[in-house]
């Protein structure tokens, strides 16, 4: 969030670029560990360090007094949410990731991202035409929602993503996305 990062990264106060790079790194490191023919603990430890750092440092988004993103392009951060959630899902079986840290990460990803994801899918940023946003906007939100649900073992969130795919109001609905 801006309070944590504005001084350190004045040109990236919303952390989008940091999350993009860190999510990709955590995912690649997790894969490298999981597919390693040797121990690969150095890859696992590096992935876990990235995941733990985000859960400890990032406290949320900068929003206006209505709880809305200042820049609507911040909805695109959902593209990285599924990637970092999938990295955590791979790492959940790593014995070196402390259970308390894993629990904290699950709570963090759900608390920080889920409210914005579900709000976007239900309101499309207040746009009168739910189809205003192209398919990729809904798909990134749906995959983020599904990934959070799977990571958190939360059937409500998993079903919310599936139900949106089947019956949602926007382009992510299969009937709207593939006419």
Predicted regions and their residues:
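Low-complexity, Ser/Thr/Pro/Gly-enriched N-terminal "stalk/linker" regions
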Residues: 1-12
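Aromatic-lined, polymer-binding surfaces characteristic
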Residues: 12-179
């Amino acid at each position: 969030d801006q309070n944590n990062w504005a001084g350190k990264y004045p040109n990236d106060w919303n952390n989008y670029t940091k999350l993009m790079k860190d999510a990709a790194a955590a995912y690649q490191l997790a894969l490298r560990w999981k597919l390693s023919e040797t121990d690969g603990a150095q890859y696992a430890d590096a992935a876990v360090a990235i995941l733990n750092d985000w859960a400890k440092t990032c406290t949320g988004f900068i929003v206006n007094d209505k709880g809305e993103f200042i820049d609507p392009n911040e909805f695109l951060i959902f593209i990285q949410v599924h990637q970092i959630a999938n990295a955590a899902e791979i790492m959940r079986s790593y014995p070196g990731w402390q259970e308390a840290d894993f629990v904290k990460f699950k709570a963090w990803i759900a608390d920080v991202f889920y409210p914005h994801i579900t709000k976007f899918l239900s309101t499309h940023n207040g746009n009168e035409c739910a189809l205003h946003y192209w398919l990729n906007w809904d798909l990134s939100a749906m995959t983020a929602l599904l990934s959070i649900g799977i990571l958190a073992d939360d059937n409500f969130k998993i079903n919310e993503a599936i139900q949106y795919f089947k019956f949602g109001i926007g382009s992510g609905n299969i009937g709207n996305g593939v006419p």
